[in-house]
């Protein structure tokens, strides 16, 4: 798993022939196709909300509260907090580098985190998760970059990626 913020380096190095990136500029020798926007929401468990945030998204409490990051390169939590309160988290950080385990850690109250809308919207509606800042999602624009060469296999992969994106992402 590579974060879309870091996949362009894999294309540049030649380690991959195609990748989902958050970079709209084509890597030399590649073509770029806009896929859509992945929407994320800052969430926490109801228990975490009461224990660390006094039941409200107070900027000072949120900044100091424990955070769950995917890994050390994960910038989504920082990006959310900079946009919402103007600074980055200063509380303890937990790293959980597996998607389902990451969401599970947030649900168990290890900290607050930014989860994809597809993974948290039902849980927000059911009350299993609390959205910390309704109306303040983190949107990440995604692009498909692939080497500019003729390859029936790469063409089929590209078609599948674009079809999946059209079905699951917000339009650019």
Kindly give the residue locations of the regions a language model identified:
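A late-sequence structural motif
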Residues: 134-172
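Central regulatory/effector-binding core of bacterial HTH transcription factors
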Residues: 1-28
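Short, well-ordered beta-strand segments
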Residues: 19, 43, 68, 113, ...
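Positions that flank functional sites
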Residues: 5, 26, 120-121, 139
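Active-site-adjacent beta-strand anchor residues
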Residues: 1, 70, 95, 113-114, ...
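Paired acidic/hydrophobic, glycine-rich loop segments that form the ligand-binding mouth/hinge
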Residues: 17-21, 111-115, 132
